[in-house]
């Protein structure tokens, strides 16, 4: 049985960096970023990649079935039994679909959802300061923030109701954030 941990947070919250550091420091964890999974598909130049790019380049969500298939395939294909995925779910529909898919099988057990909590001001400062890609400009950031904020209360409520939600303060230096997340994951 594979253990699944989801790390969610605003754009610029550090969720991808946190998750990748945990996986790098401890090889019993595999880390997948939904953003990286989707960007890899775009980079491949495939038809699916072009379709994904038409959504990502505007800061919009990629269609549900594409994302869920990419995630489940990555989990099942991993040699590791502890899987960390960041940046998912980003909508109530994604959350519901993942819950449905996980409920219908017995290979993957969702153990926890960790929210890396940062203010919008900190998120904006980090994203606009990193200039990682064409999606890191003010207009696209505003759209990405709206896409994140619109469903977050419903997502929190759903996972809190399942006793899976844990919140970590993301407005500190990276070491204590990573240590807190790792401690949570090890105890779930």
From Swiss-Prot:
<comment type="subunit">
    <text>Monomer.</text>
</comment>
<keyword id="KW-0547">Nucleotide-binding</keyword>
<keyword id="KW-0545">Nucleotide biosynthesis</keyword>
<keyword id="KW-0963">Cytoplasm</keyword>
<feature type="binding site">
    <location>
        <position position="94"/>
    </location>
    <ligand>
        <name>AMP</name>
    </ligand>
</feature>
<dbReference type="GO" id="GO:0005737">
    <property type="term" value="C:cytoplasm"/>
</dbReference>
<feature type="region of interest" description="LID">
    <location>
        <begin position="129"/>
        <end position="135"/>
    </location>
</feature>
<feature type="binding site">
    <location>
        <begin position="60"/>
        <end position="62"/>
    </location>
    <ligand>
        <name>AMP</name>
    </ligand>
</feature>
<feature type="binding site">
    <location>
        <position position="39"/>
    </location>
    <ligand>
        <name>AMP</name>
    </ligand>
</feature>
<feature type="binding site">
    <location>
        <position position="130"/>
    </location>
    <ligand>
        <name>ATP</name>
    </ligand>
</feature>
<feature type="binding site">
    <location>
        <position position="144"/>
    </location>
    <ligand>
        <name>AMP</name>
    </ligand>
</feature>
<dbReference type="InterPro" id="IPR027417">
    <property type="entry name" value="P-loop_NTPase"/>
</dbReference>
<feature type="binding site">
    <location>
        <position position="34"/>
    </location>
    <ligand>
        <name>AMP</name>
    </ligand>
</feature>
<comment type="function">
    <text>Catalyzes the reversible transfer of the terminal phosphate group between ATP and AMP. Plays an important role in cellular energy homeostasis and in adenine nucleotide metabolism.</text>
</comment>
<comment type="similarity">
    <text>Belongs to the adenylate kinase family.</text>
</comment>
<keyword id="KW-0808">Transferase</keyword>
<feature type="binding site">
    <location>
        <position position="172"/>
    </location>
    <ligand>
        <name>ATP</name>
    </ligand>
</feature>
<dbReference type="Pfam" id="PF00406">
    <property type="entry name" value="ADK"/>
</dbReference>
<dbReference type="InterPro" id="IPR033690">
    <property type="entry name" value="Adenylat_kinase_CS"/>
</dbReference>
<feature type="binding site">
    <location>
        <begin position="12"/>
        <end position="17"/>
    </location>
    <ligand>
        <name>ATP</name>
    </ligand>
</feature>
<dbReference type="GO" id="GO:0044209">
    <property type="term" value="P:AMP salvage"/>
</dbReference>
<keyword id="KW-0067">ATP-binding</keyword>
<feature type="region of interest" description="NMP">
    <location>
        <begin position="33"/>
        <end position="62"/>
    </location>
</feature>
<feature type="binding site">
    <location>
        <begin position="87"/>
        <end position="90"/>
    </location>
    <ligand>
        <name>AMP</name>
    </ligand>
</feature>
<comment type="pathway">
    <text>Purine metabolism; AMP biosynthesis via salvage pathway; AMP from ADP: step 1/1.</text>
</comment>
<keyword id="KW-0418">Kinase</keyword>
<dbReference type="GO" id="GO:0005524">
    <property type="term" value="F:ATP binding"/>
</dbReference>
<protein>
    <recommendedName>
        <fullName>Adenylate kinase</fullName>
        <ecNumber>2.7.4.3</ecNumber>
    </recommendedName>
</protein>
<dbReference type="InterPro" id="IPR000850">
    <property type="entry name" value="Adenylat/UMP-CMP_kin"/>
</dbReference>
<dbReference type="GO" id="GO:0004017">
    <property type="term" value="F:adenylate kinase activity"/>
</dbReference>
<feature type="binding site">
    <location>
        <position position="132"/>
    </location>
    <ligand>
        <name>AMP</name>
    </ligand>
</feature>
């Amino acid at each position: 049985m594979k253990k699944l941990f989801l790390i969610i947070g605003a754009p610029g919250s550090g969720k991808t960096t946190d998750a990748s550091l945990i996986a790098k420091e401890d090889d019993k964890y595999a880390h997948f970023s939904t953003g990286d999974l989707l960007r890899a598909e775009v980079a491949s130049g495939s038809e699916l990649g072009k379709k994904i790019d038409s959504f990502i380049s505007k800061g919009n969500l990629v269609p549900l079935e594409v994302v869920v298939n990419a995630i489940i395939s990555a989990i099942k294909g991993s040699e590791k039994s502890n899987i960390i995925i960041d940046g998912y779910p980003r909508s109530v529909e994604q959350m519901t679909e993942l819950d449905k898919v996980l409920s219908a099988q017995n290979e993957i057990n969702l153990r926890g959802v960790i929210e890396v909590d940062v203010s919008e001001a900190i998120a904006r400062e980090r994203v606009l300061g990193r200039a990682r890609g064409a999606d890191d400009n003010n207009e696209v950031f505003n759209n990405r923030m709206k896409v994140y904020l619109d469903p977050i209360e419903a997502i929190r409520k759903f996972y809190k109701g399942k006793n899976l939600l844990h919140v970590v303060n993301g407005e500190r230096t990276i070491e204590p954030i990573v240590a807190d997340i790792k401690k949570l994951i090890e105890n779930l």
